[in-house]
């Protein structure tokens, strides 16, 4: 799917797409990637832009952050995100401003089972870790743990888990 508009204010995005690949980088894992609307990797010539709220809770400002390279996150084998075996459900994908307020702000991806993260608030994330231990349905997981970062929900994936919880085979 793609989301597109001109990022001229809070809440807007431009040239944003999301690709989820099951069985990547290994069998029973999945990888989500922030991409251009054309589903190509973001580049400096054709970046994705996302508007985030300020990284300061008491400030109403916003910042437009640009992704100019591959931005991805892997759901590792064994990480259940709160799912049990053979369960239907949804996984939400969030963009986070990993370095709010800095000149070199960076977009990273985060995932959660529940859409409980209000975009007007700041959140701390937990590292997914790659060891199959991301098992809570109410935690926002990212590649690296982050503290007090703005988030934007950029999509979701409907899934049915396999016979073993944490094996992302379908």
Task: Show the residue positions of the predicted features.
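Polar, enzyme-active/binding microenvironments
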Residues: 1-170
């Amino acid at each position: 799917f793609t989301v597109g508009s001109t990022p001229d204010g809070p809440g807007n995005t431009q040239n944003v797409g999301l690709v989820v690949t099951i069985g990547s980088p290994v069998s029973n894992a999945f990888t989500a990637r922030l991409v251009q609307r054309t589903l190509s990797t973001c580049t400096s010539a054709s970046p994705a832009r996302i508007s985030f709220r300020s990284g300061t809770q008491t400030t109403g400002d916003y910042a437009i952050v640009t992704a100019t390279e591959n931005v991805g996150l892997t759901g590792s084998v064994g990480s259940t995100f709160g799912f049990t075996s053979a369960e239907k459900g949804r996984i939400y994908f969030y963009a986070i401003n990993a370095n709010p307020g800095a000149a070199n702000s960076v977009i990273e991806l985060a995932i959660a089972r529940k859409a409980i993260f209000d975009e007007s608030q700041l959140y701390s994330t937990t590292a997914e870790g790659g060891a199959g231990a991301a098992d809570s349905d109410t935690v926002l997981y990212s590649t690296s743990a982050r503290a007090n970062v703005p988030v934007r929900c950029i999509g979701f994936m409907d899934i049915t888990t396999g016979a073993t919880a944490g094996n992302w085979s379908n």
